[in-house]
């Protein structure tokens, strides 16, 4: 479910220290109910997932089209990414986050992990169109449980990047993300013990 940006901005996430010149594109509540210690599992499932294969045929086709266009136009080459076109956000990490675990490697998506702490994970991506950040947080639900929250930050690359992000926004919100959220929920439920829903100890 898509959330107002304030649902992310109102929380004291460490990512705010790194993204002052990025735009918060959107915020999503993830269908991943769990207990206080389940966040590492969520991070691992996101990093090991492949939305182009597990979500829907339409999403798979859109991902395939994007990668093909990127290949033809050179959007995703080595000179378009982190450390070449843009510096990595690891250069902005404060000392404590620099010494924290960076998080898992991604199996399918071209993200690079930035940091992983108890309730927060961030990874970045860069190409000819934009420099982006995916942020995952582990949010209490008010009843003793928790769930994941995902935020997407973007810094478009010039006028072309701004126009590109505006053009794909309706597809992301209406076609791409809803089936991805359902797939995340299915994967989460498949790995959750059916006997209980973990809650914080009282």
State where each predicted segment sits.
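Short terminal or interdomain "cap/linker" segment that borders an active site or interface and mediates
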Residues: 120-122, 130-133, 142-143, 147, ...
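Beta-strand/loop substructures that line and gate deep hydrophobic ligand-binding cavities in soluble
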Residues: 127-166
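Hydrophobic-ligand binding "helix-grip"
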Residues: 98-142
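Hydrophobic ligand-binding cavity/cleft-lining segments
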Residues: 1-100
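Intrinsically disordered, low-complexity coil segments
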Residues: 51-56, 99, 106-107, 141-143, ...
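Short C-terminal domain-edge/linker segments immediately following a structured domain
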Residues: 59-62, 152-156, 178-186
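A conserved amphipathic terminal alpha-helix motif
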Residues: 164-195
């Amino acid at each position: 479910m898509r959330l107002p940006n304030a649902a992310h901005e109102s929380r004291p996430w460490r990512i705010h220290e790194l993204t002052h010149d990025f735009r918060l594109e959107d915020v999503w509540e993830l269908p991943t109910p769990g207990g206080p210690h389940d966040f590492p599992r969520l991070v691992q499932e996101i990093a090991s997932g492949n939305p182009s294969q597990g979500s829907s045929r339409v999403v798979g086709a859109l991902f395939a089209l994007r990668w093909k266009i990127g290949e033809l136009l050179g959007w995703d080459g080595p000179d378009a990414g982190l450390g070449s076109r843009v510096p990595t956000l690891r250069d902005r990490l404060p000392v404590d986050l620099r010494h924290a675990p960076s998080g898992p490697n991604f199996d399918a998506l071209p993200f690079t992990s930035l940091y992983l702490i108890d309730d927060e994970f961030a990874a970045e991506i860069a190409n000819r169109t934009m420099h982006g950040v995916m942020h995952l947080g582990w949010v209490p639900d008010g009843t003793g449980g928790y769930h994941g929250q995902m935020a997407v930050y973007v810094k478009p690359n010039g006028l072309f990047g701004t126009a590109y992000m505006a053009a794909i926004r309706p597809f992301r919100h209406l076609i791409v993300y809803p089936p991805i959220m359902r797939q995340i929920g299915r994967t989460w439920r498949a790995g959750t013990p059916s006997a209980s829903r973990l809650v914080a100890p009282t």
